Amino acid sequence: MSWDDAGNDDAVLMDSWDAEVDFAGDEPILDSWDEEPKAKKEAAKPKPKPKAGGKKNAKGEEKKEQVLAIDELDPQTRKELMKKAELESDLNNAADLLGDLEMAEEHPRARAMQKEQELAAQAALLRPAMTKDTPIEDHPLFKAETKKEYQDLRKALATAIVTMHEKSSLNYSSSLAIDLIRDVSKPMSIENIRQTVATLNILIKDKEKAERQARLARVKGGTATGGAGKKKAKAKTNLGGAFKKDQDFDVDDINYDDFGADDFM
């Protein structure tokens, strides 16, 4: 083995070392062996969450503006808004304590409304259907106590009864309306009955006036008081006095003695 051969071996070793360095790529050279695990641990750490201080500050400013706006309202409106805000706050706190619930289905207020609807539906199903034998006084309208409730009852009865006139005007008048007025007037005092009669008299005058106006609309030349008006006299044809009685002549007044024999020639 010569020195030249030894030089060749050194060149081969240098080439292999350069190849190993190129194979490593462009990775940075670490100062120590434990730096690579540290870098991996730092990359695996979760990123810190942004602080919610900005949102809280924004909510605080919004709440402050709402409070200032409420202070400018009248006491009654302010009291109602504060009560509503307290109720919503209580409901939201209850929802937070129960966990992440669906607002449309699981919110306490939604559940309460749904329960009320279910109870109302059950009550409607359990309510018996009205028949001819069902007492009419069981209707809620007949539980009237105040003036307004009596007025509502009167309007409901009038609307329901008047429609019966369309079915049979004869039975409506003779078998329902007249006798009904008499029956409902029996418990009243004489003064109230007189007021009822006066009310009916006013109704009579109004009906007569309406019928008179309807008749005048059909009659040409009518008057406002209901008369048919003056009829125009028919014009007589003037024949120049040819047929006047004083100008008539009688055949018996003619004297035939003046005629002679020559008159017939």
UniProtKB/Swiss-Prot annotation:
Organism superkingdom: Eukaryota
A molecular function (GO) term: translation initiation factor activity
Basic and acidic residues composition bias: residue spans: 35-45
Gene: HCR1
Protein name in the entry: Eukaryotic translation initiation factor 3 subunit J
InterPro entries attached to this UniProt entry: eIF3-like_dom_sf (IPR023194), eIF3j (IPR013906)
Region Disordered: start-end pairs: 24-74
Basic residues composition-biased segments: 46-57
Cellular component annotations (GO), alphabetically ordered: eukaryotic 43S preinitiation complex; eukaryotic 48S preinitiation complex; eukaryotic translation initiation factor 3 complex
Function: Component of the eukaryotic translation initiation factor 3 (eIF-3) complex, which is involved in protein synthesis of a specialized repertoire of mRNAs and, together with other initiation factors, stimulates binding of mRNA and methionyl-tRNAi to the 40S ribosome. The eIF-3 complex specifically targets and initiates translation of a subset of mRNAs involved in cell proliferation.
Species of the source: Candida glabrata (strain ATCC 2001 / BCRC 20586 / JCM 3761 / NBRC 0622 / NRRL Y-65 / CBS 138)
Segments of skewed composition (Acidic residues): 24-34
Pfam family, one: eIF3_subunit
Coiled-coil ranges (or none): 78-106, 190-220
Segments passing through the bilayer: none
